[in-house]
Amino acid sequence: MLTEAQVVALEKAKTEKEAHGEFESEHHPGYCGAQDTFYVGNLKRVGRVYQQTFIDTDAKLACTKLYDRKTPITAADLLNDRVIPFYESHDVKLLRILTDRGSEYCGNPERHEYELYLAVEDIDHSRTKTKSPQTNGICERFHKTVLNEFYRIAFRKKVYRSIDEL
Protein backbone atom coordinates (compact mmCIF):
# COMPACT_ATOMS: atom_id res chain seq x y z
CA MET A 1 0.00 0.00 0.00
CA LEU A 2 1.35 3.43 -0.95
CA THR A 3 1.35 6.38 1.40
CA GLU A 4 -0.15 9.71 0.38
CA ALA A 5 3.36 11.16 -0.06
CA GLN A 6 4.35 8.28 -2.36
CA VAL A 7 1.22 8.75 -4.50
CA VAL A 8 1.95 12.48 -4.81
CA ALA A 9 5.58 11.75 -5.76
CA LEU A 10 4.49 9.24 -8.44
CA GLU A 11 1.96 11.66 -9.91
CA LYS A 12 4.59 14.42 -9.97
CA ALA A 13 7.07 12.12 -11.73
CA LYS A 14 4.43 11.11 -14.29
CA THR A 15 3.59 14.76 -15.00
CA GLU A 16 7.29 15.57 -15.39
CA LYS A 17 7.78 12.67 -17.81
CA GLU A 18 4.87 13.88 -19.94
CA ALA A 19 6.18 17.45 -19.89
CA HIS A 20 9.53 16.29 -21.25
CA GLY A 21 8.07 13.93 -23.86
CA GLU A 22 9.26 10.75 -22.16
CA PHE A 23 7.23 7.63 -22.76
CA GLU A 24 7.09 3.97 -22.08
CA SER A 25 8.34 2.24 -25.20
CA GLU A 26 6.26 -0.31 -26.97
CA HIS A 27 8.29 -2.82 -28.88
CA HIS A 28 7.61 -2.79 -32.60
CA PRO A 29 9.23 -1.14 -35.62
CA GLY A 30 7.82 2.29 -36.31
CA TYR A 31 6.76 3.01 -32.74
CA CYS A 32 9.62 5.43 -32.15
CA GLY A 33 12.49 6.78 -34.18
CA ALA A 34 15.32 8.95 -32.90
CA GLN A 35 16.60 11.76 -35.12
CA ASP A 36 19.66 13.94 -34.67
CA THR A 37 22.10 16.14 -36.58
CA PHE A 38 25.82 15.31 -36.60
CA TYR A 39 28.46 17.84 -37.65
CA VAL A 40 30.82 15.86 -39.90
CA GLY A 41 33.30 18.67 -40.44
CA ASN A 42 34.39 21.53 -42.66
CA LEU A 43 35.78 20.15 -45.92
CA LYS A 44 37.93 22.14 -48.34
CA ARG A 45 35.99 23.14 -51.48
CA VAL A 46 32.79 21.80 -49.90
CA GLY A 47 32.26 23.75 -46.70
CA ARG A 48 30.41 22.51 -43.66
CA VAL A 49 28.94 19.03 -43.84
CA TYR A 50 26.14 17.80 -41.59
CA GLN A 51 24.67 14.32 -41.35
CA GLN A 52 20.98 13.92 -40.58
CA THR A 53 20.46 10.60 -38.78
CA PHE A 54 17.28 8.62 -38.13
CA ILE A 55 17.30 5.38 -36.13
CA ASP A 56 14.30 3.16 -35.40
CA THR A 57 14.76 2.53 -31.68
CA ASP A 58 13.27 -0.97 -31.84
CA ALA A 59 14.46 -2.32 -35.20
CA LYS A 60 17.83 -0.47 -34.94
CA LEU A 61 17.47 0.53 -38.59
CA ALA A 62 19.48 3.65 -39.44
CA CYS A 63 18.99 6.10 -42.32
CA THR A 64 21.38 8.98 -42.95
CA LYS A 65 21.84 11.73 -45.49
CA LEU A 66 24.48 14.46 -45.83
CA TYR A 67 23.72 18.17 -46.20
CA ASP A 68 25.63 21.45 -46.38
CA ARG A 69 23.45 23.08 -43.71
CA LYS A 70 21.34 22.19 -40.71
CA THR A 71 17.82 23.53 -41.10
CA PRO A 72 14.25 22.37 -40.53
CA ILE A 73 14.01 21.66 -44.27
CA THR A 74 16.99 19.28 -44.24
CA ALA A 75 15.62 17.52 -41.14
CA ALA A 76 12.26 17.01 -42.86
CA ASP A 77 13.95 16.04 -46.14
CA LEU A 78 15.61 12.99 -44.57
CA LEU A 79 12.21 11.76 -43.41
CA ASN A 80 10.52 12.55 -46.72
CA ASP A 81 13.29 11.16 -48.94
CA ARG A 82 14.43 8.05 -47.08
CA VAL A 83 12.51 7.20 -43.90
CA ILE A 84 8.81 7.50 -44.74
CA PRO A 85 9.15 5.76 -48.16
CA PHE A 86 10.99 2.87 -46.47
CA TYR A 87 8.29 2.43 -43.83
CA GLU A 88 5.51 2.72 -46.43
CA SER A 89 7.16 0.03 -48.57
CA HIS A 90 6.89 -2.31 -45.58
CA ASP A 91 3.35 -1.23 -44.56
CA VAL A 92 4.61 0.20 -41.27
CA LYS A 93 3.44 3.53 -39.83
CA LEU A 94 5.99 5.72 -38.08
CA LEU A 95 4.23 6.87 -34.91
CA ARG A 96 6.72 8.98 -32.96
CA ILE A 97 10.06 10.76 -33.31
CA LEU A 98 12.44 11.73 -30.51
CA THR A 99 14.73 14.70 -31.17
CA ASP A 100 16.78 17.16 -29.19
CA ARG A 101 15.59 20.75 -28.89
CA GLY A 102 17.75 22.08 -31.73
CA SER A 103 16.37 24.81 -34.00
CA GLU A 104 16.15 22.34 -36.88
CA TYR A 105 13.56 20.30 -34.93
CA CYS A 106 11.70 22.75 -32.70
CA GLY A 107 9.85 25.95 -33.37
CA ASN A 108 6.40 27.42 -33.81
CA PRO A 109 4.23 24.45 -34.88
CA GLU A 110 2.29 26.69 -37.27
CA ARG A 111 5.37 27.95 -39.19
CA HIS A 112 8.28 25.61 -38.51
CA GLU A 113 8.87 23.36 -41.55
CA TYR A 114 9.88 20.27 -39.57
CA GLU A 115 6.96 20.59 -37.14
CA LEU A 116 4.60 21.10 -40.09
CA TYR A 117 5.96 18.02 -41.84
CA LEU A 118 5.39 15.89 -38.74
CA ALA A 119 1.84 17.24 -38.46
CA VAL A 120 1.10 16.39 -42.11
CA GLU A 121 2.46 12.86 -41.64
CA ASP A 122 0.63 12.51 -38.27
CA ILE A 123 3.82 11.72 -36.35
CA ASP A 124 4.06 12.59 -32.64
CA HIS A 125 7.13 14.62 -31.66
CA SER A 126 8.91 14.02 -28.35
CA ARG A 127 11.84 16.17 -27.29
CA THR A 128 14.73 15.37 -24.98
CA LYS A 129 15.37 17.34 -21.83
CA THR A 130 17.54 20.41 -22.36
CA LYS A 131 21.28 19.69 -22.18
CA SER A 132 20.71 15.93 -21.90
CA PRO A 133 22.24 14.36 -25.03
CA GLN A 134 22.28 10.96 -23.31
CA THR A 135 18.46 10.91 -23.61
CA ASN A 136 18.96 10.39 -27.35
CA GLY A 137 21.92 8.09 -26.72
CA ILE A 138 21.16 5.73 -29.60
CA CYS A 139 22.00 8.53 -32.07
CA GLU A 140 24.98 9.74 -30.05
CA ARG A 141 26.52 6.25 -30.05
CA PHE A 142 25.80 5.79 -33.76
CA HIS A 143 27.50 9.12 -34.55
CA LYS A 144 30.59 8.09 -32.58
CA THR A 145 30.75 4.77 -34.43
CA VAL A 146 30.31 6.39 -37.88
CA LEU A 147 32.96 8.97 -37.06
CA ASN A 148 35.52 6.38 -35.95
CA GLU A 149 34.71 3.61 -38.43
CA PHE A 150 33.96 5.64 -41.55
CA TYR A 151 34.67 9.37 -41.66
CA ARG A 152 38.13 9.35 -40.04
CA ILE A 153 39.25 6.51 -42.33
CA ALA A 154 37.64 7.97 -45.46
CA PHE A 155 39.15 11.43 -44.90
CA ARG A 156 42.66 9.96 -44.54
CA LYS A 157 42.40 8.09 -47.84
CA LYS A 158 40.90 10.70 -50.15
CA VAL A 159 40.08 14.38 -50.58
CA TYR A 160 36.37 14.79 -51.27
CA ARG A 161 35.24 17.60 -53.54
CA SER A 162 31.48 17.32 -52.98
CA ILE A 163 28.90 15.90 -50.61
CA ASP A 164 27.72 13.52 -53.35
CA GLU A 165 31.24 12.15 -53.72
CA LEU A 166 31.42 11.45 -50.00
Walk through the language-model features, giving the residues of each:
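C-terminal domain-tail junction helix/linker
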Residues: 2-25, 29, 119-123, 144-166
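Hydrophobic beta-strand scaffold residues
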Residues: 94, 124-125
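A short acidic/small-residue loop/turn micro-motif
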Residues: 58, 68-72, 102
